[in-house]
Amino acid sequence: MTRQQTKKNYSLRKLKTGTASVAVALTVLGAGFANQTTVKAEGAKIDWQEEYKKLDEDNAKLVEVVETTSLENEKLKSENEENKKNLDKLSKENQGKLEKLELDYLKKLDHEHKEHQKEQQEQEERQKNQEQLERKYQREVEKRYQEQLQKQQQLETEKQISEASRKSLSRDLEASRAAKKDLEAEHQKLEAEHQKLKEDKQISDASRQGLSRDLEASRAAKKELEANHQKLEAEHQKLKEDKQISDASRQGLSRDLEASRAAKKELEANHQKLEAEAKALKEQLAKQAEELAKLRAGKASDSQTPDTKPGNKAVPGKGQAPQAGTKPNQNKAPMKETKRQLPSTGETANPFFTAAALTVMATAGVAAVVKRKEEN
């Protein structure tokens, strides 16, 4: 529509130009006729021949002008047709170029749109991946924080348990030392009684040799001595049973000591593996090692406690006669079994519950704490 309208406007401008030329010529001719008429009206003396000649010349000029105008009009029409053809050609070329440009522009625009969509999708994908990584990292950080918090709480709990165990062992150690002192006092008392019995026996033997003539008195003294002997035999049997119990307890402590050494070896192996984690507990383990050294020192002092001497035992089957005027010691205090209660549990403490047992218990407790840390 636009190209056709342009062609029409161009043709109209050409036609208007030709028409304007004709109108100019006619105006000139009309002016000439008007002048001639005016001249005729004003003067009657004008020569008609000259007027005719002049009109003929004017007519020739007008014909020439009309011919010239017609030629120009034809020329303009030809030019107009040529211009129309050129305009159509240029319009077609411009239309093809315009369509090509529009097609290229649309292709370029479509390509840019696709590239933009692709970049936008990639950006959205990167944003999505970034958000997923951030959520994953946040969850991982939260998980590690909770794990560290649980480990710290567990370490605090184990530290409290270890502290309570250490205090309990300290109380048990004090009770064991007190029981040991009581046992040593009782042992010294029994040792003095055995020494006294030994002296009495020596005196009785000497008296029996000196008083062999007095048979009746000797028989009476013999009966009394046999009664004392039975009493001493009962005491000796009681001491023998205590010795058997002590031997059994010592064997049990030996087994516990072997188990403690095995646990100690395992603890040392685990300690080498957990050296990095054990730095935080180094000070506490050093304190426990010092307490263990004290317990071992207590054990060493316990191992030096003297047992009942064989020379103090009464010899069964032999009669003893006292000297004249002497009487056997009948005011012997019966042996009392020393019983104490542990302050931590309230149970009756074994008098043979020595520092070796405490050492085993402390070592086993430390091994259990370290093993729990390794499992965690």
Curated annotation (Swiss-Prot):
Coiled-coil segments: none
Bilayer topology term: Peptidoglycan-anchor
Modification type Pentaglycyl murein peptidoglycan amidated threonine: residues: T345
Compartments where located: Secreted, Cell wall
Keyword field contains Signal: yes
UniProt repeat feature C, residue ranges: 153-187, 195-229, 237-271
Maturation-removed propeptide residues: 346-376
Signal peptide boundaries: 1-41
Motif window: LPXTG sorting signal: 342-346
Domain of life: Bacteria
Main location: secreted
A molecular function GO annotation: IgG binding
D repeats (start-end): 272-277, 278-283, 286-291, 293-298
A Gene Ontology cellular-component term: extracellular region
InterPro entries documented for this protein: LPXTG_anchor, M_anchor, M_repeat, SMCR, SMDRR, YSIRK_signal_dom
Span list, region Disordered: 69-271, 292-348
Compositional bias per record (Basic and acidic residues), positions renumbered to this chain: 72-146, 156-203, 211-245, 253-271
Family the entry assigns: Belongs to the M protein family.
Name by which UniProt lists this protein: Immunoglobulin G-binding protein H
Source taxonomy: Bacteria, Bacillati, Bacillota, Bacilli, Lactobacillales
